[in-house]
Regions:
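Glycine- and Gly-Pro-enriched alpha-helical subdomains that act as flexible
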Residues: 176-198, 204
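Conserved alpha/beta cores of soluble small-molecule-handling proteins
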Residues: 1-169, 173-176, 199, 212-283
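Feature captures the catalytic cores and cofactor-binding loops of soluble hydro-lyases/lyases
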Residues: 205-210
Length: 283
């Protein structure tokens, strides 16, 4: 039986009751985080906590128990017997339930907090072959830096990719490549690693941040600079990053083969270093 966390309690999923007046349901008025458990620890939980607090602050959601997340996330892993597996924890915090009105509830209502854990098998094979992705105009709002649950542009775009047998949809805003529907994207051009700078047009991925640190440690030249769509023909390598896929090579983008159509050397170095770091943390 699956045990989840709901408003301070560990209960079965069936026991969860969320009001139809919940602003998460009515307005997508909430934030989320996804953290990964590597058979014994959460990777960069501090990074996720910092981003969670920032998202809550930006939406002015006052969840006073934010610091309880690391503890109940680990409890969720243990209660569901996932300690020795690769697993994820999803957390969602909404502004809470109040009669539908565009202004925030006055006085404040308690936020609704829901989290659950699940085990999964990493996509090892895809890392060897790389993935194909589509390109599409970035139809999202201009606060992509907030990890909000308002993900309709992302899900619509990802669905389009999925229906075309592609593994991600990469967005282009004003001719510049921003990020994917649920990932950041990196390019290698003449040995330099490019990714969109932190801004309101991309989510500051925790994996992105750690990849930049690892690449710097390896002496790889880095430019946090958006790549123009029309420079794609000069790109030798591409990869996406997120908590579940880590470093995932992209071998075809928008119908164009990237480099030799196989994961490139810089991608491999970064991916291997990332794996090494995880293994050393496993101890
Ligand atoms: N998504 N950009 C977007 C739009 C994302 O949704 C995500 C993650 C990322 C990568 O962030 P991180 O490295 O912190 O996972 C970038 C998660 C995995 C999701 O929505 O399930």
């Amino acid at each position: 039986m699956e045990t989840v966390y709901f408003n301070g309690k560990f209960i079965t999923k069936e026991e969860v009751k969320i009001s139809p007046d919940d602003r998460g349901f009515l307005f997508a008025d909430g934030v989320y985080e996804v953290v990964r458990w590597y058979q014994g620890f959460f990777y960069d939980l501090n990074g996720h906590m910092t981003r969670l607090k920032r998202s809550l602050r930006e939406l002015r959601i006052n969840w006073t128990d934010t610091d309880s997340f690391p503890d109940f996330a680990e409890k969720l892993i243990k209660i569901n017997s996932l300690e020795n597996q690769t697993a994820m924890v999803y957390l969602q915090v909404t502004r809470g339930a109040a009669r539908r009105s565009h202004n925030f509830p006055k006085p404040d209502v308690l936020p609704t907090v829901y989290a659950y854990a699940w085990g999964f098998l990493p996509e090892v094979k895809l890392k060897e072959t790389g993935i194909k992705a589509m390109l599409k105009e970035d139809i999202r709002w201009s606060r992509c830096d907030i990890k909000s649950v308002a993900l309709l542009p992302n899900t619509l775009s990802f669905q389009e990719a999925h229906e075309n047998g592609l593994k991600e949809c990469i967005f282009v805003r004003n001719g510049l490549i921003t990020e994917g529907s649920h990932s950041n994207i990196f390019f290698v051009i003449n040995g330099t690693l490019y990714t969109h700078p932190e801004s309101n047009y991309v989510l500051s991925g925790i994996t992105r941040k750690n990849i930049l640190r690892i690449a710097e440690d390896c002496g790889i030249k880095i430019r946090e600079e958006a790549v123009e769509e029309n420079r794609l023909r000069f790109v030798q390598e591409a990869f996406i990053s997120n908590t579940s896929a880590e470093v995932m090579p992209v071998t075809e983008l928008g119908g164009n083969t990237i480099g030799d159509g196989v994961p490139g050397p810089v991608t491999r170095i970064i991916s291997d270093k990332f794996d090494n770091e995880i293994n050393s943390l496993k101890g």
